[in-house]
From Swiss-Prot:
Gene Ontology annotations for the cellular component aspect, listed alphabetically: cytosol
GO molecular function, one term: methionyl-tRNA formyltransferase activity
EC annotation from Swiss-Prot or TrEMBL: 2.1.2.9
Disulfide bonds: none
Keywords linked to the UniProt accession: Protein biosynthesis, Transferase
Protein's UniProt name: Methionyl-tRNA formyltransferase
Upper lineage: Bacteria, Pseudomonadati, Pseudomonadota, Betaproteobacteria, Burkholderiales
Domain of life, per lineage: Bacteria
PANTHER family, alphabetized: METHIONYL-TRNA FORMYLTRANSFERASE, METHIONYL-TRNA FORMYLTRANSFERASE, MITOCHONDRIAL
Record PROSITE patterns: GART
UniProt gene name: fmt
Length: 327
């Protein structure tokens, strides 16, 4: 089916690429795609295009990669050029998903039907940069995707639609990301169909209660504090897969932990002490309970099940992982 509603799309990672693909496949014209500049990545630190750029180029969509959209920012000339490009590109609505750049009011005012954001949480919970990670880390039973009409605030716009998803007990950020990306893609296509048909999308202001912020994930958060309860550490490991991983330090070597589950405590061992090193998993004493680690990675190695890891990197009961410094 071919649609007439013209959509400018702004987004960067895989989460956004799923939405762009759905919009394109549904038949909406996309006269312009905005995405962040190519960044160095990988071991060779070669410039790599974003997932959104790769999709757009493969499907013949015009792409712009301004480093900023704020005239008063660090790149005023580039921002001015991008804003002029937006003004000169005929379109009706802008869809924004994990773009990573601030949109000033001047940009929000350009599309006739405004800017719609696809956000990976049930707003107003987990506004900000890392809503998927933080929902798992906090032990939330459910999360979802919210479509909102963007305003100048940080994820504060009126809500158009939402979809709720239960968080599975073994959910990682990687698996939850893919489920939420699919939901976001479905929601935005339905919303664009409605907007084209009705000329308006009803929206409800976000409630004042229940606001939380999902701070960007930092590499420093990877270190596991064994003084914490085992269930908290298990959530941390799941939340930080694929980035930055959970890290435990043994004799100066940083071992990444990729899969773990809380189990009952084994005796009175001090936090961080390995109490069992078996093919089924490495059990480590925690502040309360213990953590059975079933997937590990040594520096420079691959993720391995505990059985394979132990075959090449033996661990033994009584060894103790270092405790992180308490801030």
């Amino acid at each position: 089916m071919t649609h007439t509603l013209r959509v400018v799309f702004a987004g960067t990672p895989e989460f956004a690429a799923a939405a762009l693909a759905a919009i394109h496949e549904a038949g909406f014209p996309v006269p312009l795609v905005l995405t962040q500049p190519d960044r160095p990545a990988g071991r060779g630190m070669k410039l790599q295009a974003s997932a959104v750029k790769r999709y757009a180029v493969e499907h013949g969509m015009p792409v712009a990669q301004p480093p900023s959209l704020r005239r008063a920012g660090k790149y005023p000339a580039e921002a001015a050029d991008a804003i002029e490009l937006l003004r000169s590109t005929p379109h009706d609505v802008m869809v924004v998903a994990a773009y990573g750049l601030l949109l000033p009011q001047e940009v929000l005012d350009i599309p006739r039907d405004g800017c719609i954001n696809i956000h990976a949480s049930l707003l107003p919970r987990w506004r900000g940069a890392a809503p998927i990670h933080r929902a798992i880390e906090a032990g939330d039973a459910e999360t979802g995707v919210t479509l909102m009409q963007m305003d100048i605030g940080l994820d504060t716009g009126a809500m158009i639609e939402e979809a709720r998803i239960a968080i599975a007990p073994d959910e990682t950020t990687a698996t939850l990301h893919d489920r939420l990306a699919a939901e976001g893609a479905r929601l935005i296509v339905d919303a664009l169909v409605q907007l084209e048909r009705d000329g308006v999308l009803p929206a409800t202001p976000q409630p004042a209660d229940g606001v939380t912020y999902a701070e960007k994930i930092g590499k420093h958060e990877a270190a596991l504090d064994w003084r914490k309860p085992a269930d908290v550490l298990a959530r941390q490991v799941r939340a930080f897969d694929p980035f930055p991983g959970g890290v435990a330090t043994l004799d100066g070597a940083a071992i990444k932990l990729w899969a773990a589950e809380p189990v009952a405590a084994r005796g009175e061992a001090a936090p961080g002490t390995i109490v069992e090193a078996a093919p089924e998993g490495v059990v480590v004493a925690c502040g309360s309970g213990a953590l059975r680690v079933t997937q590990l990675q040594k520096p420079g190695g691959k993720r391995l099940p505990a059985r394979e890891f132990l075959a090449g990197s033996p661990l033994a009961a009584g060894q103790r992982f270092a405790l992180t410094d308490v801030a």
